[in-house]
């Protein structure tokens, strides 16, 4: 790449165009960035998601546990999932369908090293999880037939 390569422009284009969901939420859990991948996976257009709580993609039965972890991360500045570790969890689409997503998070700090938000990169793995469940069920059925 030539000397006229603009890293900031590249990063912006990459974040917007990535096929995976890229979501940034501020310290209160309000969505501030939502890319085309997030729209494809979750169904909400950018204008529908920006300014909303992350609750729009978190199944209701998991919200208390999620927010406890989120608030702990905001308080301490540390997360168990910020070192490239991938977490698989259920998520919610706009139409109410539950999907399976894998994600990793990137904590964001200000100049004073205070947490200001978290970015997450998410991938829909619903099809893979369904195939794994079907294979496991087939294996159980095969073993029971023996």
Identify the function of each model-found stretch:
Residues 4-33, 37-39, 83, 144-146:
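Sensory modules in modular signal-transduction proteins
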Residues 46, 58-101:
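PAS/LOV-family and closely related PAS-like sensory domains
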Residues 93-95, 104-110, 121:
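PAS-family sensory domains and close relatives that share small-molecule sensor folds
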Residues 37-49, 111-112:
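PAS/PAS-like sensory domain cap-loop motif
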Residues 109-112, 129-130:
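Charged alpha-helical signal-transmission linkers that cap and connect PAS-family sensory domains
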Residues 1-8, 123-137, 142-146:
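PAS-associated C-terminal cap
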Residues 114-124:
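PAS-family sensory domains
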């Amino acid at each position: 790449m030539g000397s006229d390569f603009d890293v900031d422009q590249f990063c912006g284009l990459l974040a917007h165009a990535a096929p995976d969901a890229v979501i940034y939420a501020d310290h209160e859990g309000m969505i501030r960035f939502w890319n085309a991948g997030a729209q494809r996976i979750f169904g909400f257009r950018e204008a529908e998601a920006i300014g909303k709580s992350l609750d729009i993609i978190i199944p209701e039965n998991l919200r208390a546990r999620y927010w406890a972890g989120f608030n702990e991360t905001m308080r301490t500045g540390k997360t168990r999932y910020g070192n490239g570790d991938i977490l698989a969890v259920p998520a919610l689409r706009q139409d109410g369908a539950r999907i399976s997503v894998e994600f990793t998070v990137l904590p964001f700090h200000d100049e004073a090293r205070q947490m200001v938000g978290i970015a997450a990169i998410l991938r829909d793995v619903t099809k893979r999880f369904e195939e794994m469940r079907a294979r496991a069920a087939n294996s159980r059925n095969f073993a029971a037939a023996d």
